[in-house]
Amino acid sequence: MKLSIFAAIFMAFVSLNQVFGSMTHSVKSKEAIISADESLVKPIDAGQAQPEGCPVCARLGVLCPYHYRADS
Protein backbone atom coordinates (compact mmCIF):
# COMPACT_ATOMS: atom_id res chain seq x y z
CA MET A 1 0.00 0.00 0.00
CA LYS A 2 2.79 2.43 0.93
CA LEU A 3 4.64 1.53 -2.24
CA SER A 4 1.63 2.34 -4.46
CA ILE A 5 1.16 5.74 -2.78
CA PHE A 6 4.85 6.49 -3.28
CA ALA A 7 4.64 5.35 -6.91
CA ALA A 8 1.61 7.57 -7.56
CA ILE A 9 3.30 10.63 -6.04
CA PHE A 10 6.50 9.91 -7.97
CA MET A 11 4.63 9.55 -11.28
CA ALA A 12 2.77 12.82 -10.66
CA PHE A 13 6.08 14.56 -9.94
CA VAL A 14 7.67 13.18 -13.10
CA SER A 15 4.67 14.22 -15.21
CA LEU A 16 4.68 17.77 -13.85
CA ASN A 17 8.43 17.99 -14.30
CA GLN A 18 8.11 17.01 -17.96
CA VAL A 19 5.30 19.51 -18.58
CA PHE A 20 7.06 22.46 -16.98
CA GLY A 21 10.40 21.44 -18.44
CA SER A 22 9.00 21.51 -21.96
CA MET A 23 7.38 24.91 -21.37
CA THR A 24 10.58 26.49 -20.10
CA HIS A 25 12.54 24.93 -22.96
CA SER A 26 10.22 26.50 -25.55
CA VAL A 27 10.47 29.89 -23.82
CA LYS A 28 14.26 29.73 -23.80
CA SER A 29 14.52 28.73 -27.44
CA LYS A 30 15.41 31.42 -29.95
CA GLU A 31 12.26 30.87 -32.03
CA ALA A 32 9.99 31.64 -29.08
CA ILE A 33 11.69 34.91 -28.12
CA ILE A 34 10.59 38.06 -29.94
CA SER A 35 13.38 40.41 -30.89
CA ALA A 36 13.33 43.78 -29.15
CA ASP A 37 14.16 45.45 -32.47
CA GLU A 38 10.82 44.52 -33.99
CA SER A 39 7.97 46.97 -33.61
CA LEU A 40 4.93 45.39 -31.94
CA VAL A 41 2.60 48.39 -32.23
CA LYS A 42 2.20 51.36 -34.51
CA PRO A 43 3.63 54.61 -33.13
CA ILE A 44 1.11 57.33 -32.28
CA ASP A 45 1.48 60.65 -34.05
CA ALA A 46 1.35 63.23 -31.23
CA GLY A 47 1.00 66.06 -33.74
CA GLN A 48 -2.60 65.18 -34.59
CA ALA A 49 -5.26 67.34 -32.99
CA GLN A 50 -7.44 65.62 -30.45
CA PRO A 51 -11.14 65.46 -31.35
CA GLU A 52 -13.14 68.21 -29.70
CA GLY A 53 -15.93 67.23 -27.36
CA CYS A 54 -16.56 64.03 -25.50
CA PRO A 55 -18.87 61.53 -27.21
CA VAL A 56 -20.30 60.51 -23.83
CA CYS A 57 -21.06 64.13 -22.92
CA ALA A 58 -22.64 64.68 -26.34
CA ARG A 59 -24.77 61.55 -26.03
CA LEU A 60 -25.97 62.39 -22.49
CA GLY A 61 -26.40 66.10 -23.11
CA VAL A 62 -24.63 66.85 -19.81
CA LEU A 63 -21.06 66.50 -18.58
CA CYS A 64 -19.99 62.90 -18.07
CA PRO A 65 -18.59 61.95 -14.63
CA TYR A 66 -15.01 62.21 -15.91
CA HIS A 67 -15.39 65.79 -17.17
CA TYR A 68 -17.61 66.83 -14.28
CA ARG A 69 -14.79 65.94 -11.86
CA ALA A 70 -12.20 67.65 -14.06
CA ASP A 71 -14.09 70.97 -14.06
CA SER A 72 -14.77 71.13 -10.32
UniProtKB/Swiss-Prot annotation:
The keyword Signal applies. The keyword Nucleotidyltransferase does not apply. Induction: Expression is induced during host infection. Keywords: Host cytoplasm, Host nucleus, Secreted, Signal, Virulence. Transmembrane segments: none annotated. Residues 1-21 form the signal peptide. GO terms for cellular component: extracellular region; host cell; host cell cytoplasm; host cell nucleus. It is found in: Secreted; Host cell; Host cytoplasm; Host nucleus. Disulfide bonds: none annotated. Rust effector delivered into infected tissues to modulate host functions and contribute to pathogen virulence. Enhances leaf colonization by the bacteria Pseudomonas syringae and the oomycete Hyaloperonospora arabidopsidis pathogens in an Arabidopsis thaliana infection model. Belongs to the CPGH1 family. This is Candidate secreted effector protein MPL124499. It comes from Melampsora larici-populina (strain 98AG31 / pathotype 3-4-7) (Poplar leaf rust fungus).
